[in-house]
């Protein structure tokens, strides 16, 4: 099944609005895009928030993480719905 859902995870000292210029471009290509709004209170909290976003998607998900978001997608990436991880200037395993 092709991936049609993309979940974007922002880095530290940022929020989901950092993806505002990217989201319409991906949507124009036919993707359903969600920008996670992490609290940045702890890694565990941010992973839980990202996992909730994954659970709301109706099929395979591509996770995209910027900066600290790379750590978050690495932890959340073990979900069976996740088809791949994209690291954008991110901390990778």
Q: Model segments located where?
A:
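Serine-dependent carboxylesterase/thioesterase catalytic core
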Residues: 4-6, 10-12, 25-27, 33, ...
């Amino acid at each position: 099944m092709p991936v049609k859902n993309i979940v974007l995870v922002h880095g530290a000292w940022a929020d989901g609005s950092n993806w505002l210029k990217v989201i319409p471009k991906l949507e124009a290509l036919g993707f359903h895009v969600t920008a996670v709004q992490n609290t940045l209170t702890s890694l565990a909290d941010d992973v839980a928030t990202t996992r909730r976003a994954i659970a709301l998607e109706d099929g395979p998900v591509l996770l995209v993480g910027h900066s600290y978001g790379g750590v978050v997608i690495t932890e959340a990436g073990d979900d069976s719905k996740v088809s791949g991880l994209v690291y954008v200037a991110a901390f990778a395993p």
